[in-house]
């Protein structure tokens, strides 16, 4: 429920639309994880290499962890195609094609994942403070983030290089990071203010 609650509130006025299984792995398991990597977005493209490397290292560790046995995985860039391509290339070098096929690992943008789900999804926010970034408030932004945040069946990781105070509260990125960092508190209160 924790994973889908953000999307449900964002797009469906809080009505629960999915009953994806969560918390099936005991106390060590959290259905939502955030990782601040303090990376920097490159000036000439939409790549945050530190974030990409952190995601790849985490995917590799998850593939080696018995808790993730037989789980499919996906990586979604929340800013353009380039980050997903870099992550895909790094995964091919670190894991190899056989392990990528075995885990059904897919890398791309939210639209790459339309109609697709994976047990574990890793989101890359990409943006950082070294380059100005837009406040995302359009319906198309909301749809993109809704797709990204509703692809995980068991666990979602959000990798970021900015903090809440770096963004406008109106930005969908702010709302996602706030939810992921505070989902246990928000769910106990029973609601999250999206708009």
What are these regions (language model features)?
Residues 1, 80-83, 112-114, 127-130, ...:
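Conserved nucleotide-binding/hydrolysis micro-motifs of P-loop NTPases
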